[in-house]
A protein has these predicted regions:
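A structural signal for short hydrophobic beta-strand segments in well-ordered beta-sheet cores
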Residues: 57, 67, 102-104, 241-244
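Short glycine/serine- and small hydrophobic-enriched flexible loop segments
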Residues: 27, 126-133, 217-224
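Metal-dependent peptidase/peptidase-like ectodomains
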Residues: 169-170, 180-214
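Active-site metal-coordination/substrate-binding segment of hydrolases
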Residues: 76-144
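N-terminal helical capping/dimerization or prosegment-like subdomains
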Residues: 2-90
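Acidic/histidine-rich catalytic neighborhood of metal-dependent amide-processing enzymes
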Residues: 117-190
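Acidic-enriched catalytic cores of C-N bond-cleaving enzymes acting on peptides and small amides
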Residues: 202-250
Length: 251
């Protein structure tokens, strides 16, 4: 972008202001969006994108919202994406602040999904609208901003639909990074282990096989024998138990 384009962009940024970004973020936070129930958030995101001047806005069959700004028919395709969903807030009475209140205190916004990733989504939407105001002709290609669903539960399928639609040359994901540009991801493998015991009454455990005891032994064995790899650039791998389910029988 030449000097004229940079000057235009700075003027556009100055015209929006901090309050517009804060207000958009608060509106997102005030709309709960538990994974699989993101409809209210999605409708608001689509509405906002249209108001911000996106050239096209679609909500796909999964519920993802994808807005597009076209600078030219040819050129690179950039995708900015952040999730709209979050895990359940649980008992809201246990929170020190109402999780969907979007309160501001000491220059911080408090709310479920503020950093993961509604704050990023608000920033991306406004940033894209600012770029559209550039009239220098220096920007080429297409810019997509996507609000993704099911990130907490079904991300591989739902997010793939965004990628298939936008067909991007480059992607920026709104994961929290301490305002650092992170350019790699360790990847993830989900491993399910089923352990079957033999039922017995708790007063006579010697007649059965306690699957929970076997699971404890298995986890100890796994941690003692398997060390996650370390990459010079990406750092240490991790191994963590995330879910444990057992039979509903208590005796």
């Amino acid at each position: 972008m030449d000097e004229f384009g940079v000057r235009n962009l700075r003027q556009a940024v100055a015209s929006v202001g901090r309050d517009d970004l804060i207000q958009l973020c608060q509106e997102l936070l005030r709309r709960p969006g538990v994974s699989g129930r993101e409809g209210d958030v999605a409708r608001f995101v689509a509405e906002s994108m249209r108001s911000l001047g996106f050239d096209s806005v679609v909500i796909d069959s999964y519920g993802n919202v994808v807005g597009e700004i076209i600078f030219s028919a040819e050129g690179p395709r950039l995708l900015l994406t952040a999730q709209m969903d979050h895990v359940d807030a649980g008992d809201v009475a246990e929170w020190s602040k109402y999780p969907f209140g979007a309160f501001i205190e000491e220059n911080r916004i408090y709310g479920r999904a503020a950093s993961d990733q509604k704050g990023a989504l608000a920033s991306m939407m406004l940033a894209a609208s600012l770029l559209k105001r550039d009239r220098s002709g220096a920007l080429q290609g297409r810019l997509f901003v996507a609000g993704a669903v099911h990130q907490e539960t079904f991300e591989r399928v739902a997010s793939k639909a965004i990628g298939d639609f936008a067909d991007p040359d480059c992607v920026i994901v709104g994961e929290a990074s301490g305002l650092l540009l992170e350019r790699g991801q360790r990847g993830r493998a989900e491993i399910r282990v089923d352990i079957f015991g033999r039922m017995a009454h708790s007063s006579h455990p010697e007649f059965g096989v306690n699957a929970a005891d076997v699971m404890v032994e298995f986890l100890s064995f796994l941690k003692s024998r398997f060390t996650p790899p370390r990459d010079e650039f990406l750092g240490e791998g991790i191994l963590v138990l995330t879910n444990l389910f057992s039979s509903p029988s208590y005796n």
